[in-house]
């Protein structure tokens, strides 16, 4: 559970492991989960969580504060998954158990978002993992194929290339889930997912498919396509530190070469709303006065003319299995061809993409993807995508601006939303003016399920993939 962080692979974390607090419903609310309550010290640097008593791991042993401490230490040690969320806030060795059912986090600095991020402190059975450690690997090889959680379901089979199978854990602290078994399968082809749902091979599938496929599903009498407003930003990540993208003129040329109206109105059938900056429009802290960029090849050419030399061929990446990502890459290539910029497309699967994003040498020139909601706060977008300390983490554009860092640090240290909001608004304005990325639209969630499925609880954090609430008639 500490090896990955993306929403594409959140299902096994949500269903097989538990966290201190959990985001539920839409608009998302942060609810007690393993922790019944928490307190914050006056200086905002010490968080103390009181745990539920009697919570069981899948092997029947009790979950205690020592397991929470071990889980945080493990996140910091393996440096994967949610590590970027905590690396700048929590020092190794600073988290401690205060008795059997309380845990204390001692932060390096006050943080307005720490409680919100504890949704991603998935707690593992420390005794079980320790027994399976090899050469100081924190049990990474073992846990990749085995279960060490307390969640609503017990992993029975896990294969990154195929998906996972899990069975109900009857002793979960909230009681047993409704479904006896859940089976998440990796199916790369959109058409195969659609046909499988129509035939009844699956009970639910991908909520972010191309609009023509959503319409196809909406026309089937045996299916129900749920709709909900979300906070999931679709954008193009531009490598800001590699030539020619390190020239603001070329980044602006890229922004002017994308056909926003054609994308939103024609390809997506007006199912989404334009988002001109880094923070989704529905989120507080999103400015209302950022006009953004339009599709204007003449302006793109004018900015290219201001460059010291003509741009080289650039690589535009999309993600295999995510049709919109690949379509958007092709649309930008079309605009760049009109602007006289050579480019080539490279579509790769998400595990390959996510590894390359963490390495500035391997990162693509331009990559189309989504920034999902990991915690309901503007820092989830502005801070994670733009702060210099998120290089090799969420900031795969390797954007860096000292003024933006200063504004983000000030916002993070202040618990007052009214004071934080204008700081994030200014960050969004600056990154738009500097063309830090190509910001395109906020996404709507379309959840396709068979009509015999009920109890779906959509939350933007996790995209409605928590299965304990579902029933099948």
Model segments located where?
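N-terminal lobe/hinge region of extracytoplasmic solute-binding protein
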Residues: 1-42, 73, 148-150
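Gly/Pro-rich hinge or "lid" segments in bacterial periplasmic/extracellular proteins
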Residues: 24-26, 121-177, 181, 298
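Surface-exposed binding/hinge segments that line
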Residues: 39, 50, 85-132
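Ligand-site clamp/hinge motif
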Residues: 141, 169-215, 334, 342
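Append "and occasionally in soluble cytosolic enzymes with long acidic Gly/Pro-rich linkers
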Residues: 165-168, 245-334, 338-339, 400, ...
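Extracytoplasmic/peripheral linker and loop segments enriched in polar/acidic and small residues
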Residues: 338, 342-355, 383-450, 473
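Long beta-strand-rich cores associated with HINT superfamily self-processing modules
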Residues: 447-473
